[in-house]
């Protein structure tokens, strides 16, 4: 579960290494790109949710710099995810992929496995870039 002030690893090559959640959005990808549903008042973010975050640590010559405010989609959480078939999956660390306003990743690569729930949330570009979908 990701909440404001939570720190996440960045699982892409956009230049950011670590981000801190500022706000959790009620959101997903709609027919015309990214829809936030008015922001909402959601307390926690899970896999597939979009957050607003501040870049805390970045590579020297990356596309994003430390201090930038970005949108990101959560791809891994250390809190267990319960699935419809009764199984659960849990990752070692929390991680996110930085996205633009259309819901597409800003980087060209995704590192590490991502959860299958991203496919249900229509983040197909992230799923296709990931080396493994669990």
Swiss-Prot record:
It comes from Deinococcus radiodurans (strain ATCC 13939 / DSM 20539 / JCM 16871 / CCUG 27074 / LMG 4051 / NBRC 15346 / NCIMB 9279 / VKM B-1422 / R1). The keyword RNA-binding applies. Belongs to the universal ribosomal protein uL14 family. One of its GO terms (cellular component) is cytosolic large ribosomal subunit. The gene is rplN. One of its GO terms (molecular function) is large ribosomal subunit rRNA binding. InterPro entries: Ribosomal_uL14, Ribosomal_uL14_bac-type, Ribosomal_uL14_CS, Ribosomal_uL14_sf. It comes from the Bacteria. SMART domains: Ribosomal_L14. Signal peptide: none annotated. The keyword Ribosomal protein applies. This is Large ribosomal subunit protein uL14. Keywords: Ribonucleoprotein, Ribosomal protein, RNA-binding, rRNA-binding. HAMAP family: Ribosomal_uL14. It holds the Pfam family Ribosomal_L14. Forms part of two intersubunit bridges in the 70S ribosome. Binds to 23S rRNA. In the 70S ribosome, L14 and L19 interact and together make contacts with the 16S rRNA in bridges B5 and B8. Part of the 50S ribosomal subunit. Forms a cluster with proteins L3 and L19.
């Amino acid at each position: 579960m990701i909440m404001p002030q939570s720190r996440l690893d960045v699982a892409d090559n956009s230049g950011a290494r670590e981000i801190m959640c500022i706000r959790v959005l009620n959101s997903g990808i709609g027919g015309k790109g990214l829809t936030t549903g008015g922001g909402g008042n959601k307390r926690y973010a899970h896999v597939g949710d979009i957050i607003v975050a501040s870049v805390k640590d970045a590579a020297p010559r990356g596309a994003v710099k430390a201090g930038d405010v970005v949108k990101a989609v959560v791809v891994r959480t250390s809190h267990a995810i319960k699935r419809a078939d009764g199984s659960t999956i849990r990752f070692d660390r929390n991680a996110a992929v930085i996205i633009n306003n259309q819901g597409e990743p800003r980087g060209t690569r995704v590192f590490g496995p991502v959860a299958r729930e991203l496919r249900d949330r229509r983040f197909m570009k992230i799923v296709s870039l990931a080396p493994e979908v669990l």
